[in-house]
């Protein structure tokens, strides 16, 4: 049953990421999505459906890895530092 919850959440998260990426240019959309997902993970401390599933499907490590492969090192640094800071901020809101 846990796998079903994660799979359902991942599908919903991926659809949400796709919809947002249609509204905003790709690199900026990806950064915003990853920052938002990190913040929500820290703030809500979600269960399997919403954490591992939805937020795992919503955020994108593969697109981040592709940008790294293409040499976007500043973008990668901003993403890593920004996502850690967003998670810490969300965690502070949860406390």
From Swiss-Prot:
Pfam families, A to Z: CRCB (PF02537)
GO biological process: cellular detoxification of fluoride
Catalysed reactions listed for this entry: fluoride(in) = fluoride(out)
Topology in membrane: Multi-pass membrane protein
UniProt keywords, alphabetically: Cell membrane, Ion channel, Ion transport, Membrane, Metal-binding, Sodium, Transmembrane, Transmembrane helix, Transport
Residue ranges of the TM segments: 23-43, 49-69, 70-90
Binding-site residues for Na(+), renumbered to this chain: 56, 59
Domain of life according to the entry: Bacteria
Chief location category: membrane
InterPro entries on file: FluC (IPR003691)
GO molecular function, one term: metal ion binding
A single Gene Ontology CC term: plasma membrane
NCBIfam families assigned to the protein according to its UniProt record, in alphabetical order: PRK00134.1
Protein role: Fluoride-specific ion channel. Important for reducing fluoride concentration in the cell, thus reducing its toxicity.
Record-given protein name: Fluoride-specific ion channel FluC 1
Organism encoding this protein: Corynebacterium diphtheriae (strain ATCC 700971 / NCTC 13129 / Biotype gravis)
């Amino acid at each position: 049953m846990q796998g079903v919850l994660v799979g359902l959440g991942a599908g919903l998260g991926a659809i949400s990421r796709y919809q947002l990426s249609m509204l905003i240019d790709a690199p900026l959309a990806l950064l915003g999505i990853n920052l938002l997902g990190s913040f929500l993970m820290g703030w809500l401390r979600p269960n399997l459906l919403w954490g591992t599933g939805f937020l795992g499907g919503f955020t994108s490590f593969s697109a981040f890895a592709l940008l790294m492969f293409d040499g976007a090192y500043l973008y990668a640094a901003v993403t890593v530092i920004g996502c850690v800071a967003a998670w810490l901020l969300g965690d502070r809101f949860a406390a």
